[in-house]
Amino acid sequence: RPVMPQNFLIDPVATDINSALGCAVDEFVSSHLVEQLQESGVYRDEPLSIASSDFNLEPDQELTTFSEDKVRLTKYYGLVPTHLLKEAMQDPDAEDEEVVEFSEEDEENYYTEAMIVIANGGILLKAEKNPYMMQDRPVVAFPWDVVPSRFWGRGVCEKGYNSQKALDAELRA
C-alpha cells in the first residue's frame, strides 16, 4: 500500500533502500488492528495507551483529528546490532516459546537484518530476524527522476520548472 513521504523515514545519506542502514514507516493506525494482532500472537501482548497527536504524521494538517483510538506504529526494516536483537527476541514471560537460533555467520556479524515494530515511540511489539526469503526489505521507493546522491530524486513539479521558465521567457520575448 502507498505510504506518504512524511511517514517514510530513511537514513539521510542513503541513495537507495538497500544502501541505507534501515528504513521505517511511521504512521497512526487504529488501536483495534494492533489489539487483533496481539490476540493472534503476531505482536507481543503489551499494554497500549492512546498516542498523542503529531501533526507532521497526519495526512492533512488542516483537518481536525481525534486522538482517541489510535496508536502510533513504527515499523523498522533494517540492520540491528545482533546482541540487541537477541536480547529483544527473548521474552521473559514465555516459558514454552521456541528458542530462535542464530547461525555462526549471524553470530560473527555485528549487524543482523531485522524487522522491528514499536508502538507509541517506546513499546516493543515485535522484534525478529528478517522473515523474507531473499533477506530484502519490504519497501519499494520510486523517484520520478533520478538525481545522483539523492534518495528522493526530483519530483514532477521540479522537473517541469526549467521548461516552464523557458516557455514564460519565450512568451515575453
Regions found by a protein language model. Name each.
Residues 1-173:
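Extended alpha-helical, oligomerization-prone segments that build pores/tubes and scaffolds
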